[in-house]
Each structure stands twice: as C-alpha cells, then as structure tokens.
C-alpha cells in the first residue's frame, strides 16, 4: 500500500497528524488568532501568517510539498481543490481580503510564484497543468502615477480557466484572463483578457498562435 493510499484510507487520523505538523512552531509562524489550516497534506512546507481570520483549506487527496505559504493581512484565503498537487509553490498574499484559488485535479510542478495583493484574486480552474518558473501577479507592488499624481496601475484579478496548460517560464500579469482548453507556450507573457477557447497563446505580449486545439496530459 502506498503512502498516499494509506493517507486517503484514514483521512481523520492522518488529517490530525498533519494538522499537528503544520502548527509546530519550529516549522511555521502563525501569529494572532482566528487563523485556520485544514485538510489535505503538506510536507516540508513553510507557513507564515501575520494577520487575523485567514484560512488555508486543502481538498481531500491534495498534496503540497516543498511549498511556501505567506499571508500578510487579514481575512485572506488560500483554497486548493481536491486531488491537486503543488510542488515548490510560493503562494503569497499581502494586504487584506486577498484570495488564491486552485481547482480540483490541478498539478503545479516546479518553482511557481503566485502573488496576490490589494484584496484581489488569483483563480486557477480544474484539471490544469502548470510547469516550472511560472509567475502570476495581480499587481505591480509599486505605484505608477500620472502628472496629476493619480495612480494609473491598479491591481486586477487574474482568471485562469479549466484545462489550461501553462508552459515553463510563463508570466501572467494583472487583469489577464485565460479561457478553458488553452495552452500557454514557454516564455509567454500574458497581459490581457482572452475569450476564445481551444487556442495556443505565445509571445510577448501573448497572442493567439494556433486555434481549434485540445491537449491531454498523456502522450497519446
């Protein structure tokens, strides 16, 4: 019997065990009250929470390994759906009300940085595949002003649909929308909203390179 099968067969016992591990002070720093971590499996992860009333919720069968989860704010949430895998993920929320949502059966492999600020949301749908050295950001972290002193670079949500395959070294910036059944080619920089499904996006800035496609995790 594999470790994962054993864990799945005894969810209450193993869930309690990982709850204890994830709250050990030498592993993690969870300050103030009202913060909750529940579900899933986290191994060799580091958690830093400095606000109040934050939630980290992992679905059944989900496994995070060698990840870093940071929340610097209050009323923030990280939701990972069932049967998903994240390895070497850096999930970062700053300011109040931010949300990072990853769907069911989505795999994130290799160093990936999800940065959420100013109460915005990063959402990744079901059955997705994310390669290494991927960056997703909802904002610029610093202000750009016009000559009247008004800020012109507000943060915006990022939406990634179901069944999206993101290649290596892709950057996805504020306001981007990637619809379902899309492949994002290696090195692409996505800066705007796309609505057409079944395409390959590539280039800087990203544009539609191919149409009427679908993809499969298996080498058929």
Language-model features and meaning:
Residues 1-46, 50-55, 59-61, 74, ...:
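Terminal amphipathic alpha-helical/low-complexity segments used for targeting or macromolecular assembly
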Residues 48-49, 53-176, 205, 211-213:
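Flexible, glycine/small-residue-enriched loop-and-beta-strand segment within the central core
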Residues 109, 184-185:
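Short, well-ordered amphipathic alpha-helices
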Residues 129, 187-188:
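Solvent-exposed alpha-helix faces
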Residues 140, 193-194:
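Nucleotide-sugar donor-binding loop of glycosyltransferases
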Residues 150, 190-191:
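Short secondary-structure boundary/capping segments
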Residues 176-177, 188, 194:
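Short beta-to-alpha loop/turn elements within the nucleotide-binding domains of ABC transporters
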